[in-house]
Amino acid sequence: MLPAVLRAEAEPALDYLLKQLVDFLGAEGHALREHDTPMSYYDYLCDIDHSVGYLWAAQVFAGYQLQELRAEVRAMWNHTGMIQAPMPKNKWKEIPVAQIYPAQKELIAYLRANNVDVWIVSASLEEVVRMVASDPEYGLSIPPERVIGVNLMLKKPNGDSTVGALERREGKKGIEYYFSKERMQWKLGTYPFAPLTWYAGKVAAILEWIDPSDRPILVAGDSPNDFYMQFYAAADQDAI
């Protein structure tokens, strides 16, 4: 039984993924219901382990063109009050709107003033995080190639596929490229690309995409998801 709340134009592969997900959750003892939603599936998966749920939180965007996703991000950011997420049996879950705190902007500005390169390593979908972290509209202006998160395959209109992490390896830089009209027409798929950036995977991402030997001099985080990355910081350099 598939969730009632999904975009009609979602990636066809998402239907196949959902069927696998239903079988998996059923085997775990969940009584799936007609009015289950993408959010309730996420909760079911996180009941097993958060590492199981994080990938679904990225895959649910399959089928979106990047320009569509950017419009959704802007709408969410401009939303006032709590976001009402649909749950089974006509129930709703209230979720606070994400925000950037003044202290975060101050810290980033201070680091830049002292010639420290600032990166973001997130357990969220990389494309979503980049749309906020790199867009000057939101006040952080992190270079888009320095935003690392969960990567899903991207499909181009001509049928070719790529992934954001490979663009980083190829040396693609700047918002002129990442937010270009051509790239914004690419569509998200369902297939993930390693390393997956949660828990110990954040350290793997640092090694893979930032530096294989030098450690960060400072790591900031707000959840147990960040502990591995925080303990990886170079303590001999007075890191936090």
Predicted regions and their residues:
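A metal-dependent, Asp-based hydrolase signature
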Residues: L2-I95
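C-terminal cap/substrate-recognition subdomain and adjoining C-terminal extension
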Residues: I48, L55, Y64-Q67, A71-I240
